[in-house]
């Protein structure tokens, strides 16, 4: 089984195997999750100063902010043209 990588915008890449959820940042509970992650030091801001459009939650409790729409991230996750790394190649 290889490692599947997904582009979350501006050349930032995340391991797709570690994703738990891709959500919109608009609701109050998600804003609370973002603030709690910031307080714990588990927030990764990959927006490059742009508006946050997607919040990615990982199985390690890291919260990643992306400037790409959640639908776009999900579409990249489901396509076959994504980046895949075989463990044998490493």
Swiss-Prot record:
InterPro entries: RemA-like (IPR007169). Disulfide bonds: none annotated. This is Putative regulatory protein Cbei_1140. Pfam families: RemA-like. Belongs to the RemA family. It comes from Clostridium beijerinckii (strain ATCC 51743 / NCIMB 8052). PANTHER family: REGULATORY PROTEIN SSL2874-RELATED, REGULATORY PROTEIN TM_1690-RELATED.
